[in-house]
């Protein structure tokens, strides 16, 4: 391993240039993009003057129309030919003219041969014959004078010059033929604008495109690049739409779930509607003004790292003006090379569409395949600084000429700083000193088969290539990411080596988390590379699961900040700085972090950190990793069964959730400050809503309508043998009902402050409570179903968040039951609470935050005298639990809400036994059935009778909860001998707390069969991570030593020395942990074989039993029976 491979970019540029091609190599643009008859490779251009002129001009429909039947090519008079540039080999080639060096006028010339550049003679001579007339003035603004360009035909038609009527009609026929070849969106939106402005030079200066593919002027390109890209407007104004790359680009933008999904997403839909409805003359200016607030400025910093700054920084405007006022020679040079945006991000619109000119440099990916050249491997670490996390050799496409051109324009006398990296060998030794190599391989396998399915931001082939490359271990972001992966995966395996205390499963990954925090302090670890962003995101998820909320929110905020710094929230489709893989990975990474931000904001009552209005990045494409290459999509067909389809559906639900969160928060009135009150109303721009969240509810219905049937949760999905389909469909189903539940909870919470006074209002209050309860029960029933089938390993911390929300909602529903009308919903709510707390305790073996959420719900039930016989934690050993939260008292107590009806003076009796049995049960005694007398809330006792404090649970989570040393915690009520009696004195001393066992043993059978479980019935596994080293059989992921794991990713002393392969074939069996199975873990297979028969109950059956109040949680999970 040679650390010298990891130095600055200057050492690898010659290698990249050498591998790019030889002097006589035909232009890749010719081979990869053009299917037109006029497009010919520059290496085969004849040396005759007329042929050179024909083949070096960009192909236009007007030139194609010359061969069309019935077209009069003699319509152009002698004055037209006089205006053509005298292209003769006697003058210097384009490159020598730009560089102002001597050219020997050969084709190709000697300087171009020596520098491996294409030699062209496109630029017109400056000694062009200047004919007089109106047509010269029109064409002179175009830069390159094309005889059949639209501007020249328009000008000729306008002047006439006394042509005969037949000649004029022939010209009109030719013009109509040209217009028919123009796509409707381009024609309607821009053609008239171009016609009006081509010769005037006013406004933003729209100009004719030349061979470099300038197209629309720099101002419109810089401000409306994304819009123009979605309009499929190429550099030559759309007159040649036949290139294969251009068609691929058009299909790329449409590659979403289905036509319905495509119609509702993306920028092209609203842009077309907006532009086509306006006057053609004003379309460009309106679009310019619309995009003014969303200007982006991507740049490379001092080490070549791509970064972003927004409009208020002033850089976008300055760059726009600088590009618009650049000297003509520099503008022509940048246009001819077609690489302005790759170096200084000048013209996103022009660069987003591949040029069809044969002499224009093709828009190649910014990185090459890691296996293509040894040079690619050598340059991999520096590539991470520029192309973030994906692949190797990212600077392979940059030639030395491009770097020289960049230096000529910006800081020509300065060189970039070398990218600071680590010593790969030292980094490898430090990490493997904490995480053994064989265990690391297993944890990586586990991550790819579990957590990655929830947040699939990785391009797995590129990641596995980097994982096997020793040089990558010198990159700080990559090392942090590997440690973060191992930290999160440690919660999904049963190997004692992942635990800080081998006897305590709750300490799994803690030592890795400490290592991660140390690595984050290393130089360059905080740079906004994709691996650094992803590492902070995964570490935040682990911290949430650990219950360390302050650190979790800190890491989540860091990941979002790095996203903003790297511009992940902005679209980069218009820039060639990033290849197709990196563009998609940026999208996936950002939307994963965006969704988690909304999830945590909803659970903890915090405002989201980033909003949809701050972003313009599009949704990830519906394409699996095996069909995505640096050049683009291999198979462009839309597969509704793709795993990315479920991910996009998840993103859209979280977008709706943001609207729900925002609608629940109204701007403050600031009664003592009129200025702040006015400013708050102005900034919020939110009007009062009589029917709140109606728009969000309609969006939710639209989401449900366009969801592909394959991912709908129905009988067919529940009976599927594919665990990925089952778990993803149930995940979407739960998330949909989570959003609905928050909407209904927000609506009925209004009746707490202002109780219903009429029968109609009381009926509406009851209906909202019932709907919220049904959504909560649906979430709980789905998770019970997944858990009993042994497939909870495919889920993560989001399960705890959803169950916590469902439990709080059920508590709120029960506390709203103040009259006899609400009696039917009490028993189902209490039964749902019992199952909810049981699942949270069951999941606490993997994530401590589950125990915290269960204890908090239990404590609310105790304070409010809600009789929940909470299931215990499996295999608990006994340790006191901390006081997770204690509400801060207000100086003025809030009076309890008024009863809903005149005949009701207090809350109902919450004991389901009393509600369902017409016997002489004690309805008013707390000791027997924990009922509440009709005297109101006064009998609850203690200062906790403040109902407003009970409802405002979200504010409590800002109070840091105590963390037991070593991560151990019990519950306050779970294992009390008499669970029905909750008269426990919670005071400063914990001496009276009933002790519940800690988690000294795995939460069997949960942590054993719901880790990495087999699926032998599914046939071929889809994850095949293997190497040529001896398999590590020292432990079993299931804890069953009789069936050890035999396919580890063992590595030799050198990092990643083993050969890694990955099989992506779905084969109709999904993707994930089923291929990681051993014979000792057959619960997933059992669940799939039994389906809804045998001892397993379907989610619908569980929900029905809960609604009846007759579901027995302890009969399903006997290890948690009271």
Curated annotation (Swiss-Prot):
Low complexity biased stretches: 40-74, 369-380
Biased composition (Basic and acidic residues): 400-416
Name under which the protein is recorded: Transcription factor TUR1
Result of knocking out the encoding gene: Leads to dysregulated gene expression, decreases resistance to phagocytosis, and increases sensitivity to menadione and antimycin A (superoxide generators). No sensitivity to cumen hydroperoxide or sodium nitrite (reactive oxygen species), sodium dithiocarbamate (inhibitor of superoxide dismutase), rotenone (respiratory chain complex I inhibitor), dimethyl malonate (respiratory chain complex II inhibitor), or oligomycin (respiratory chain complex V inhibitor).
Gene Ontology molecular function, alphabetical: DNA binding; DNA-binding transcription factor activity; DNA-binding transcription factor activity, RNA polymerase II-specific; zinc ion binding
Record-linked Gene3D superfamilies: Zn(2)-C6 fungal-type DNA-binding domain
Main location: nucleus
Keywords: Chromosome, DNA-binding, Metal-binding, Nucleus, Transcription, Transcription regulation, Zinc
Region (Disordered): 1-84, 130-151, 328-424
DNA-binding span(s): 93-119
InterPro entries linked: AtrR-like, Transcription_factor_dom_fun, Zn2-C6_fun-type_DNA-bd_sf, Zn2Cys6_DnaBD
Cell compartments where the protein resides: Nucleus; Chromosome
Polar residues biased stretches: 14-39, 353-362
Gene Ontology biological process terms in this record: DNA-templated transcription; regulation of transcriptional start site selection at RNA polymerase II promoter
Gene behind the chain: TUR1
GO CC annotation: chromosome; nucleus
Job of this protein: Transcription factor that regulates alternative transcription start site usage when cells switch from growth in exponential phase to stationary phase, and acts on genes involved in translation, glycolysis, glycogen synthesis and mitochondrial proteins.
């Amino acid at each position: 391993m040679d650390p010298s491979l990891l130095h600055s970019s200057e050492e690898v540029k010659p290698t990249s240039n050498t591998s790019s091609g030889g002097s006589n190599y035909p232009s890749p643009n010719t081979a990869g993009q053009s299917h037109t008859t006029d497009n010919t490779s520059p290496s085969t251009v004849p040396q005759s003057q007329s042929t050179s002129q024909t083949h070096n001009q960009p192909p236009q429909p007007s030139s194609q129309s010359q061969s069309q039947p019935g077209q009069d090519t003699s319509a152009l008079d002698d004055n037209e030919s006089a205006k053509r540039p005298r292209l003769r080999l006697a003058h210097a080639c384009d490159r020598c003219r730009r560089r102002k060096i001597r050219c020997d006028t050969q084709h190709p010339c000697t300087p171009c041969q020596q520098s491996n550049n294409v030699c062209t003679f496109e630029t017109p001579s400056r000694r062009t014959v200047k004919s007089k007339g109106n047509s010269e003035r029109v064409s002179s603004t175009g830069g390159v004078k094309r005889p059949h360009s639209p501007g020249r035909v328009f000008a000729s038609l306008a002047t006439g010059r006394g042509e005969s009527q037949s000649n004029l009609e022939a010209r009109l026929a030719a013009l109509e033929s040209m217009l028919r070849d123009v796509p409707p969106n381009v024609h309607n939106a821009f053609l008239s604008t171009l016609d009006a402005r081509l010769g005037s030079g006013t406004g933003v200066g729209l100009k004719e495109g030349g061979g470099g593919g300038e197209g629309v002027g720099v101002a419109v390109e810089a401000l409306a690049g994304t819009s123009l890209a979605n309009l499929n407007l190429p550099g030559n104004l759309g007159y040649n739409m036949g290139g294969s790359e251009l068609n691929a680009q058009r299909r790329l933008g449409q590659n979403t779930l289905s036509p319905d999904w495509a119609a509702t997403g993306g920028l092209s839909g609203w842009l077309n509607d907006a532009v086509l409805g306006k006057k053609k003359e004003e379309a460009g200016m309106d679009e310019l003004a619309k995009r003014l607030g969303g200007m982006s400025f991507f740049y490379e910093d001092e080490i070549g790292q791509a970064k972003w700054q927004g409009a208020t920084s002033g850089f976008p405007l300055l760059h726009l003006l600088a590009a618009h006022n650049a000297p003509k020679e520099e503008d022509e040079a940048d246009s001819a090379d077609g690489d302005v945006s790759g170096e200084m991000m000048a013209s996103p619109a022009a660069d987003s569409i591949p040029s069809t000119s044969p002499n224009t440099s093709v828009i190649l990916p910014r990185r090459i395949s890691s296996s293509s050249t040894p040079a690619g491997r050598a340059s991999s670490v520096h590539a991470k600084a520029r192309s973030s996390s994906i692949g190797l050799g990212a600077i392979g496409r940059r030639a030395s000429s491009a770097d020289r051109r960049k230096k000529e324009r910006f800081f020509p006398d300065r060189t970039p700083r070398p990218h600071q990296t680590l010593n790969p060998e030292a980094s490898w030794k430090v990490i493997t000193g904490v995480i053994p190599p064989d265990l690391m391989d297993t944890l990586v396998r586990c991550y790819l088969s579990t957590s990655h399915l929830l947040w699939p931001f990785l391009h797995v082939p590129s990641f596995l290539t980097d994982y096997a490359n020793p040089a990558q271990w010198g990159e700080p972001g990559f090392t942090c990411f590997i440690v973060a992966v191992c930290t999160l995966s440690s919660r999904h395996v049963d190997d004692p080596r992942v635990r800080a205390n081998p006897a305590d499963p709750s300490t799994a990954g803690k030592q890795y988390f400490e290592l991660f925090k140390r690595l984050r302090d290393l130089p360059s670890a905080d740079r906004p590379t994709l691996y650094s962003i992803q590492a902070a995101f995964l570490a935040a998820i682990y911290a949430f699961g650990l219950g360390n909320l302050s650190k979790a929110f800190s890491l989540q905020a860091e990941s979002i900040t790095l996203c903003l710094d790297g511009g992940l929230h902005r679209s980069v489709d218009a820039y060639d700085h990033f290849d197709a893989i990196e563009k998609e990975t940026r999208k996936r990474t950002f939307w994963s972090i965006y969704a988690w931000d909304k999830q945590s904001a909803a659970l903890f009552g915090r405002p989201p950190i980033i909003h949809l209005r701050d972003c313009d990045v599009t949704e990830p494409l519906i394409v699996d990793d095996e069909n995505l290459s640096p050049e683009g999509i291999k198979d462009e067909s839309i597969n509704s069964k793709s795993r990315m389809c479920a991910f996009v559906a998840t993103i859209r639900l979280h977008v709706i959730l943001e609207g729900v969160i925002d609608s629940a928060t109204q701007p403050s009135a600031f009664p003592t400050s009129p200025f702040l009150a006015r400013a708050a109303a102005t900034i919020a721009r939110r009007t009062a809503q009589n029917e709140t969240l109606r728009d969000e509810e309609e969006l939710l219905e639209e989401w449900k309508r366009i969801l592909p049937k394959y991912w709908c949760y129905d009988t067919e999905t529940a009976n599927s043998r594919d665990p990925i389909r089952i778990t993803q469909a149930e995940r979407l189903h739960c998330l949909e009902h989570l959003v609905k539940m928050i909407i209904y909870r927000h609506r009925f919470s209004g009746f707490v402050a202002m109780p219903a006074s009429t029968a109609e209002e009381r009926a509406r209050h009851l209906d909202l409570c019932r709907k919220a309860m049904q959504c909560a029960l649906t979430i709980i029933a789905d998770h019970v179903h997944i858990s009993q089938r042994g497939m909870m390993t495919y889920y993560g911390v989001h399960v705890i968040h959803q169950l916590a929300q469902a439990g709080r909602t059920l508590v709120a529903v029960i506390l709203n039951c103040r009259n006899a009308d609400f009696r039917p919903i009490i028993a189902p709510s209490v039964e749902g609470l019992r199952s909810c707390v049981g699942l949270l305790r069951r999941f606490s073996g993997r994530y401590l935050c589950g125990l915290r959420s269960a204890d908090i719900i239990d404590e609310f039930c105790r304070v409010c005298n809600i009789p929940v016989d909470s299931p215990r934690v499996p295999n608990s050993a006994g340790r006191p639990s901390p006081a997770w939260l204690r509400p801060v008292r207000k100086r003025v107590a809030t009076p309890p809400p008024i009863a809903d009806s005149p005949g009701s003076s207090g809350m109902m009796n919450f004991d389901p036994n009393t509600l369902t049995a017409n016997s002489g049960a004690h309805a008013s005694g707390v000791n027997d059935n924990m009922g509440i007398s009709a005297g109101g809330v006064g009998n609850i006792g203690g200062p906790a009778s403040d109902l407003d404090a009970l409802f405002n649970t979200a504010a409590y989570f800002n109070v840091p909860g105590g963390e037991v040393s070593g991560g151990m915690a019990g519950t306050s009520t779970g294992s009390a001998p008499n669970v029905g009696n909750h008269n426990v004195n919670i005071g400063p001393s914990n001496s009276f707390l009933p002790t519940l066992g800690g988690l000294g043993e795995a939460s069997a059978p949960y942590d054993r069969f719901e880790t990495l479980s087999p699926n032998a019935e599914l046939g071929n596994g889809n994850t095949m991570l293997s190497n040529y080293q001896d398999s590590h059989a020292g432990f079993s992921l299931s804890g069953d030593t009789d069936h050890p794991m035999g396919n580890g990713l063992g590595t030799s002393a050198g990092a990643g020395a083993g050969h890694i392969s990955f099989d992506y074939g779905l084969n109709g069996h999904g993707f994930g942990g089923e291929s990681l199975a051993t014979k000792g873990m057959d619960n997933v297979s059992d669940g799939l074989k039994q389906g809804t028969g045998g001892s397993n109950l379907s989610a619908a059956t569980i929900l029905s039993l809960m609604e009846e109040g007759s579901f027995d949680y302890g009969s399903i999970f006997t290890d948690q029976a009271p």
